[in-house]
Amino acid sequence: MALSVLLALPFIGSVIAALLPTNARNAESTLAGLVALICVVQVALLFPALGNGGVIREEILWLPSVGLNLVIRMDGLAWMLAMLVTGIGALVVLYARYYMSPADPVPRFFSFLLAFMGAMMGMVLSGNLIQLVFFWELTSLFSFLLIGYWHHRADARRGARMALIVTGAGGLCLFAGALLLGHIAGSYDLDVILASGAIVRAHPLYTVTLVLVLLGAFTKSAQFPFHFWLPHAMAAPTPVSAYLHSATMVKAGVFLLARLWPVLSGTEQWFWIVGGAGLCTLLLGAYTAMFQNDLKRLLAYSTISHLGLITLLLGLNSSLAAVAAVFHIMNHATFKASLFMAAGIIDHETGTRDIRRLNGLFKVMPITATLAMVASAAMAGVPLLNGFLSKEMFFAETVYISSLPWVEFGLPLAATLAGIFAVAYSLRFSYDIFFDPLSTDLPRRPHEPPRWMRVPVDLLVLACLVVGMFPEISIGWALRAAALPVVGGQLPEYSLSVWHGFNAPMIMSVVAIGGGIVVYLWLRKRLEGGRIERPLLIGFFDGKRMYERTLAAANLVARRALLLFGTHRLQSQLFVLMSLTVLGTTFALWGRDFSWGERPLIPISPMFATLWLVGMAGAIGAAWQAKYHRLAALTMIAMAGLATCLTFVWFSAPDLALTQLAVEVVTTVLFLLGLRWLPKRIPLELPITAQTLLRRSRDLALAVLSGCGMAALAYAMLTRPFPQSISPYFLTRTLPEGGGTNVVNVLLVDFRSFDTMAEITVLAAVALTVYALLRRFRPPRETVQSPPQQRALPPDLITDLINPRIARDTALGFMLVPAVLVRLLLPIAIVLAIYLFMRGHNESGGGFVAGLVASVAVILQYIVAGTQWVEAHMELRRSRWIAIGLLFAVITGLGALAFGYPFLTTHTAQLHLPVIGEIHVPSALFFDMGVFSVVVGATLLILTALAHQSVRSHRESAHSGAP
């Protein structure tokens, strides 16, 4: 299987999972499990090509002129992470099948899980630095959705937002660092960057680049001082925690450090920043974990500590330490995933995760207890388990480090202290829960979980045992393949033997185990007695509080800046904007020779001059009437827009004219819907004061100056000869390469299709934002009543005996005739939209114009028939139109990649149909179909959000409570 297919498979599975019915629990889990299983098998089959330092590489051309191609690259390190992502992902899917409640929206869960798996695979397999950052940000996005999966819970929403803000900010720093790194190396290709270590380290921008990259890595892997988000992410379902916070998301940061280790390591800056952050995180996480009373929070802080251990190893500037870091990435993923699953089983079967309430579970859950105790022993570094081996390598590296004397003395002590803490919190997880008398006040009667729910824990704990007892046979080959790309050359000598003799690392292990037991016994009495409620000495240090204070300070600064520089009046904002424009233009032209060009002028037609006089009159009249008569102002704005439309026709630009006309109609409808809910204007007090008159004169002068200045600049530019035009390029290539004769449409859906896809994505985001803002909007009381023209007349009040109404109610059938006419217009407009869409590649039209026509036809039904009638007869599903449109656009682009062409390359097929004859069907037709769908969905979503105000209750007036 090609790497590109391997990368695309989870995303395809995610889309399919999202489309399955809500109650298809078994189908969802089976689909997700098959996708993960196929991926893990395919990744495993690729190992023979990578075992001796080989690299598998696929490159798909995208923007070769700027060095941006889709590069999928797998070496030993990427293979190891891909195995963890897919292997543990498959186990998590099986576990989640039994963990998730029948009331949970399972399609959404498995869709997000597969999408996150695809994002992690994309990041791991990226062979281009910008591409890596893109997938890096995707992991932040999908982790946000997974952490906040139970969005009805406030802690889940807070934890998801915190994780997104912290990791998203780090991602922006990483993006800046990637740009600098690519600038220094001369390429964003990972192979080029990995070979440019000496150049990068000697460059003046090395320190800045290093700090930016490390900010991205530290925020993702919860390194001090960005560690606080991980415990709050425990509000996620336990399968999410077992996947994201053991083997995938939190490993992204240390993976980045390992990936760029040959390029950035080996300097004093690397040693002190990376090593210092890792050491602080190691000690802080381990110490804090001992005091936690929630199972998942204990595991979260222990994860922080182990991530700090890996970071510290990578920061020691030692090849052997880098090998140990890679080894611990593998070991930590296995025992921590099993511990999270065991914690989830305990929570699932007892109804609580509070260690203070859980006792004696070994009596009722002996198998689960045994598995959890073995995994916690691996976490503590007990011999004959995998955690012991990498911990011994860590101890050895701290003992034999060559640095400053105080570092050589203090680092082994700190490592031993962290080991003591690890044993203590591991005992809290195991002994406190499974021994002592059985708790009797649990929310549920505890018992063993379903057999298949426990199978993932069985397999992971078995891996801990096998690796711990037979490391060279079971994992040595994989470790060598994964570590070789990290060290960037020949591997250092090391041994994975269980016994290395009685040496300094062994003494440190004995001290850690013995000291951990003592600390646990001392701590247990005080925790049970309630004498300790928070970590000693550092209880005042609360990362969450610091985070919230930082956000509050930023919000305060923004509010004060808004009060100082901002205004809620549009007139003041426009005054500042236009004043700055005039001043900037004047400054740029000051002292320069400003003159008209020498191009010959076209004789002006009296008809054209009359047309623009009408347009100018409409614009001026709209400005005059906007304050007094809104409907008249709207009519005059439409008159100015119609003049612009006819101007395009005059200059033989039918596509622009058609688009302008459709946009004018949509804009008019938008204004009509919006003006309905504006409060009535308060009559102006007369006479007008001198201050008001002065302000209006100032605004008039600025408006005239701005308008005349823009006209003068435009005239000066248009009367000068144009530089070399790009028009011949498109005119000669549109038909042979784009398969159409309409240059404008082919330009949009072929030559510049990626820009168009970005634009419809922005349009979709804007529509969803407007909908979200208007969803909770309530019109003021004074706008709820119908206008006088629509109110009931006396004859209605007399004759309507079935539904008696008062004079303020809506008149019976006041829009009956227009409603009938507009309903008859709907099918005609839809046929017209289809006609415009189908002819767009060769004649005036296209998906954008067709979408606007269809949208206007539907929204007119709302205007004349009302919201309730339309939605009782039509099921619009506006958001699905947007989603389907974006999906069409993306699939069209990926289809070109599948055939070896650049993204969104158009292919034209010649078909011969009976009766119709020969036709040509360009693949851009499907892209244009996506544009049509997004335009329909976005336009209807925005306009119907306004239309829905008519069926909502009013809000109180701002002056309703005034005496």
What do these predicted ranges mean?
Residues 56-66, 189-198, 390-403, 473-499, ...:
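Membrane-interfacial helical/loop segments at transmembrane boundaries in membrane proteins
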Residues 444-585, 706-711, 719-734, 774-809:
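Membrane-interface and transmembrane segments of multi-pass membrane proteins
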Residues 61-80, 196-210, 399-411, 494-502, ...:
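Short aromatic-rich membrane-water interface segments that cap or initiate transmembrane helices
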Residues 1-2, 15-111, 180-203, 207, ...:
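Transmembrane helix-loop-helix hairpins at membrane boundaries of multipass inner-membrane proteins
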Residues 83-84, 130-136, 167-170, 204-216, ...:
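Alpha-helical transmembrane segments
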Residues 66-70, 354-357, 439-446, 494-496, ...:
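Cytosolic juxtamembrane amphipathic/interface segments immediately preceding
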Residues 91-132, 141-449, 587, 600-603, ...:
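Hydrophobic transmembrane alpha-helices and their helix-loop junctions in integral membrane proteins
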Residues 602-611, 623, 677-832, 837-841, ...:
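Flexible extramembrane loops and terminal tails that flank transmembrane helices
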